[in-house]
């Protein structure tokens, strides 16, 4: 009798135990993350990815054809946002993640557009699926996929891109600012990198055609620490919109000088210094009235979808800081989208996961997530029910980031100095 009972208990143990621990004991799915970790768009992406992985693993992992497997994150520093670092260094990191770290998928970067474009050939060579989640605003990325699908079908982007940002988000918003200010004048200050030159160049042409006065157009090398000469020119021009497009931390200096010089133009654009929740304190309130496009909802507080504040609170609790800027919510969301695709594919085989990703249709932190099946670019919208929605916020006293655009998710209105 005793032997019989022991036998039954052993059988039950074999049947029950795997269901409880299978994800931990199974071979992990390795996510390789090439990120510029010393910069905002690198570390916030890393935190977003790790938060999602922790949540998914705590729930049992990923169901791959009936077997639960955990995600494992491997982050390596590409240094591609640092001045003077060659693209080749980022490529070496991507290759190392694939060959040495045995990454099953690449998520995150490279972050700089030039590096990500160069990495596309590596991803194609090794047939490795990549989902860009941060940086890389150049429209060349998804256009290249559409032009040569068979070669670049492994490349996806789950975040916004410059052409859509400019034409469908920033230009309409600049027009609203012009109407509010009562002046159709703009002064441009851009970083000397591909996405900033392209983005501001397109905006300049569009606004000129709309009859706006372009009072100046200044380009600054990455790492510039003095913007006073350009700001003095802007001050001389009078009221208007100060369009700033910079992803470097030194843009903090620009905002401080803007306030010190009392430039009457209101800052708006894609501005690294404005994004972070600590910007108000770091600049002594110099960011007041400044506005930035953080590309995706969830990078500033709003009720875009039921996911948005759930993510916002979870990130804040996990990292002790609110979501910090562009790349945060999209990096978090990419892990859930990848999980969903793997589970529908029932395998890690690239061709089947690609087809599953192309069929993605799920609500997320910043709206409905779908990919264009030809270009693998996430489909944008101004309504989160229809697609991936952006978020433009303004710093307002006493130190809050207030989402002011688009109207579908806005929690406040633009205030003028």
Region roles according to the model:
Residues 26, 40-47, 62-146, 158, ...:
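Beta-alpha junction/loop-to-helix N-cap segments that form part of ligand/metal-binding clefts
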Residues 103-217, 266-292:
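Extracytoplasmic ligand/sensor domains, especially the bilobed periplasmic-binding protein
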